[in-house]
Amino acid sequence: ALVTLLKGFKHVGLPISTGASYGLAALFGLLTMGIGALMVARIQLDPAADREFHFANVEKVFAVLMMITACSMAFAHGSNDVANAIGPVAAVVSVVQSGGNVTQQSGLPLWIILIGAVGIVFGLAVLGHKVMATVGSGITALTPSHGFAATLAAAGTVVLASGTGLPISTTHTLVGAVLGVGLARGIAAINLQIVRTI
């Protein structure tokens, strides 16, 4: 939320002060925490159950938390990949609008951002299912707790890179996070044939 408030809104003409951005980000964090706590509180836990059932209860909690990190990953994907996709178009439009002068910084028209967003959505709709299947189950078996760890690490890395202006690949970052989760259980937990093709 803080990256959006500090960096994103200024491109659409809604500059927010730094202090207000931190306050709104803290409120958003508290709201997300409250929603997560309500969802986790609804899960039925049985303290008299056996050990395997306790692991299932933990996975139920992480299934709820996974929804939050999946939203974070979607945000990170949009904040990073749309910028990577529209960068060359924005540069060309800037040069054309300035009469051939190359400037250090220029405004970004909203229609360019929308074209980038539509392109990302179209790409996900057409080829996204193959990437999701490979990352979600092809590299290693993922439980909700493993998926939570991988998406939290990948989303945090991508948002940090987007906020600092580093162009990185969201997909490669997520694949690296999934590999890390798989390696935590040993090299045998990873499908090396799939990793070679990636």
Feature names for model-found ranges:
Residues 1-198:
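Multi-pass alpha-helical transmembrane bundle typical of ion/small-solute transporters
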